[in-house]
Structures are given as C-alpha cells and as structure tokens.
C-alpha cells in the first residue's frame, strides 16, 4: 500500500531529522479508529510551534491524474468532507497543517514529496475547485526520495517553516531556542 508506506516514510524522515539535527520533536502515525473518521495521517509534536504539525499524506502517480481531486482522494463520511473536518480540527488544536503529496513517477525516475500548506487546500475546497492543481502542488517545498527514504535538512525545513500559518515564522529563531539539544 503506497499510502501507508508513505506515512511511515514521513514519520521516519521527521524523527531522523530530529535525531540528526538535535531537535526536540517526535513524529508518529495517527491511526484511524474503526468506524471513526480519521483526522490527519501523521502528527508531529514539539514545544516550538514550528514543529507542531498535522500532515495529511497522499501518494499519487502523476501520469494517471493531473491534480489531486477532492471527491476522489478525500473522504466524506456522514456527509462531512475530510477537508472541512480537518480544517476545523486544525483551528481547535493550534497545529499547522500540511497536505504532503508524494509523486510516484515510476521506475528509474525520482519520487518526490511536496508540502502544500493546508490553507491552500482549504481555500481551493471553499472556492468550489475540483481539487488542487499540480502547478500549486509543485510550487511548494519539496524533498526527493533517495536510497529508499526521505531525508530532511535544515534548509528544507526552513522552507516548510516559512509556509506556516502561525507565528513565529523565523526558522532560525526556532533552532536557537532552548528546545534544541
């Protein structure tokens, strides 16, 4: 299952980043309870707001779809669409949300993931768009999969932090805080 594997890859990438760069954060999969709607796939917990994240992971083959469709790639149990449910949860929890889209390009080509700010997802949904166009997705911060895994560095994380909805948005200040080892 590409989706579940991608979720595990995200958890490993965030936890490896924390270990490598001495950040106090922990990432884990947010498992779906039976008969309950799921809220985000991966959560990242940390005292600094910069790493207090909720990630919705989608893994797609770009040769088969031109965009990420709201009806096809998101759920709507009990008539409440996943984007609405997760947007409300972000508002209540204070987390920063990202739609992390993995583009599987096939054998011999590199696989990449893109961090789309949740505000873009919510805006497109509320505007009545069919989905999120590939142009929007590919303009967001991205990371390539190498050696079978994603590896984040400070430069990539700074790009992600600049996309946050809440403050502070200065990644350098986040790194100097007492929360670093």
Annotate each language-model stretch with its function.
Residues 1-36, 46-48, 180-181:
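Acidic-basic catalytic patches of nuclease active cores, encompassing PD-(D/E)XK
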Residues 137-181:
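Charged phosphate-binding loop/patch that engages nucleotide di/tri-phosphates or the phosphate backbone
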Residues 110-151:
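Short, low-complexity, polybasic intrinsically disordered segments
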Residues 42-44, 51-63:
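Conserved catalytic cores of phosphodiester-cleaving nucleases, focusing on short active-site segments
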Residues 57-76:
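Short beta-strand-loop-alpha-helix junction that forms the active-site gateway
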Residues 83-90, 148-150:
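Mixed-charge (Asp/Glu-Lys/Arg
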Residues 87-121:
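Nucleic-acid nuclease catalytic cores
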């Amino acid at each position: 299952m590409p989706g579940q594997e991608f979720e595990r890859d995200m958890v490993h990438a965030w936890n490896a980043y924390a270990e490598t760069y001495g950040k106090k954060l922990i990432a884990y999969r947010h498992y779906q309870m039976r008969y309950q709607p799921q809220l985000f796939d991966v959560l990242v917990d940390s005292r600094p707001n910069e790493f207090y994240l909720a990630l919705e992971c989608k893994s797609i083959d770009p040769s088969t779809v031109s965009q990420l469709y709201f009806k096809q790639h998101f759920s709507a149990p009990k008539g409440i669409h996943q984007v609405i449910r997760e947007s409300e949860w972000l508002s209540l929890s204070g987390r920063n949300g990202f739609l992390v889209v993995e583009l599987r390009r096939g054998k011999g080509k590199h696989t990449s993931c893109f961090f789309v700010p949740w505000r873009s997802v919510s805006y497109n949904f509320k505007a009545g768009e069919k989905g999120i166009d590939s142009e929007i997705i590919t303009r967001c911060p991205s990371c390539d999969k190498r050696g079978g895994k994603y590896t984040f560095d400070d430069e990539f994380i700074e790009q992600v932090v600049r996309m946050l909805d809440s403050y502070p948005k200065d990644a350098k200040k986040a790194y100097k805080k007492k929360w670093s080892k």
